Swiss-Prot record:
Taxonomic lineage of the native organism: Bacteria, Pseudomonadati, Pseudomonadota, Alphaproteobacteria, Hyphomicrobiales
Alphabetized SUPFAM superfamilies for the sequence: Peptidyl-tRNA hydrolase-like
One cellular component (GO) term of this entry: cytoplasm
Protein name: Peptidyl-tRNA hydrolase
CDD domains in the record: PTH
Organism annotation: Methylorubrum extorquens (strain PA1) (Methylobacterium extorquens)
């Protein structure tokens, strides 16, 4: 069994925030693979799903981002899932928009959801890093992640979540390299090989106007 966690903040106010792309991806996995309805459990919302031959629990912690580890730890203990079989989907500032990378363990890069999970559960879990790009200035990060995706970003966000969902059985099977490659090819095929952040797009537009 796998525990697949999407990180985000609960409530309509945060639903389309960049910080909530983990929730969006897990919702799409649930939709594509016809998961059971989400129920309130483990200080979050949880649903069972079959991904290929692997049974998985989808989890969206409802504790707010900074306390995500409480929810993850509760679900992990209940199902007795090894930490290596916990997979966390989260927004990644240090990855270009529309890119995806999978890694095991490592640092938290200032991500408070990961920091909470690491503190309460340990570090050797798999992370699916969903690139949202960086606003360019550290002082802008807080507002950037807690703002909604711009309208111009929504198409690639939807396509990234769909590609993640389509190939989730590979992720559940532990075939991380194949999963990552399939998502990359799907995104390239949809024209998302190079995507600028809104700030980068604005600068490029200003340069073109001069």
């Amino acid at each position: 069994m796998r525990l697949i966690v999407g990180l985000g903040n609960p409530g309509a106010r945060y639903a389309r925030n960049r910080h909530n792309i983990g929730f969006m991806a897990v919702d799409e996995i649930a939709r594509v693979h016809r998961a059971a309805p989400f129920r309130r459990r483990f200080q979050g919302e949880a649903a069972e799903v079959m991904l290929g031959s692997e049974r998985a629990i989808l989890l969206k912690p409802q504790t707010f981002m900074n306390e995500s580890g409480r929810s993850v730890g509760e679900a992990q203990r209940f199902f007795k899932i090894p930490l290596a079989d916990v997979i966390v989907l989260h927004d990644e500032l240090d990855l270009a928009p529309a890119k995806l990378r999978v890694k095991l363990g490592g640092g938290n890069a200032g991500h408070n959801g990961l920091r909470s999970i690491t503190a309460l559960c340990g570090n050797e879990y798999r992370r699916v890093r969903l690139g949202i790009g960086h606003p360019g200035d550290k002082a802008l990060v807080h507002a950037y992640v807690l703002n909604d995706f711009a309208k111009s970003e929504e198409p690639w966000v939807e396509d990234l979540c769909r590609a993640t969902a389509d190939h989730a059985p590979l992720l559940a099977a532990g075939e991380d390299a194949s999963f990552q490659n399939k998502v990359h090819l799907a995104m390239a095929g949809r024209g998302w090989e190079t995507v600028k952040t809104p700030a980068e797009a604005g600068k490029a537009k200003a340069r073109d106007a001069n």
